[in-house]
């Protein structure tokens, strides 16, 4: 079975919708996706993800199934460097890397700032929602592997957000989302692909075959959005520092 995880198009966060650029990205993505066969489509309830999904869904006259746990990862923390509450990722590297528990696949969510922000409950909600969905499609979580109840080659499509995508990937790959949040960037309308591997009958794991693919943008000369990235060098004042 294959999982395709899509981040929404270039966002207008204030309006929870897409920018004009984001709508163009979504149409280019739909050009790619409409050539593929998906057994099921799951969508975040947030507007920017729904608008991205709709560019694809309306072409096929089908509907996606909304899953609340696919919303952007919601807990916030107070960031002393910024002086106000912010998301649970985008820490300064010298801050988060100093806490070794952040690298632990289970310990990351139990660092005091995470506990105080309600991260464990939110993360478990995402984990449970994902596992319940995978069981519906024939793969049941058992410890660190998946029991194959119904082996299949279906393709499942998700429209969601970078933060929750990394939480999902951490669960499927057995790693903390912190290095994913801070060491990767799923650009807008990028596609991440995971595939089951059943090397022994009845026992499966997921392998990530590609991360953040934006070939559908590059092929048509669309420069990927800078959204979710930070400045390449300190002296580049045109790019985001915080």
Name each region found by the language model.
Residues 30-110:
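Phosphate-coordination/substrate-recognition cap region in phosphate-metabolizing enzymes
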Residues 73-90, 145-155, 167-242:
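Acidic, low-complexity terminal tails and accessory targeting/binding regions
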Residues 45-46, 69, 151-163:
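Short, well-ordered beta-to-alpha junction loops that form the rim of enzyme active sites
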Residues 1-4:
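Extreme N-terminal starter segment of soluble prokaryotic enzymes
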Residues 111-145:
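Internal catalytic-core helix/loop-beta-alpha segment
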Residues 7-20:
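Glycine-rich N-terminal loop/short-helix segment of MobA-like nucleotidyltransferase
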Residues 18-33:
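Short catalytic helix/loop segments, enriched in acidic residues and glycine
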Residues 9, 162, 212-214:
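Active-site metal-binding loops of divalent metal-dependent hydrolases
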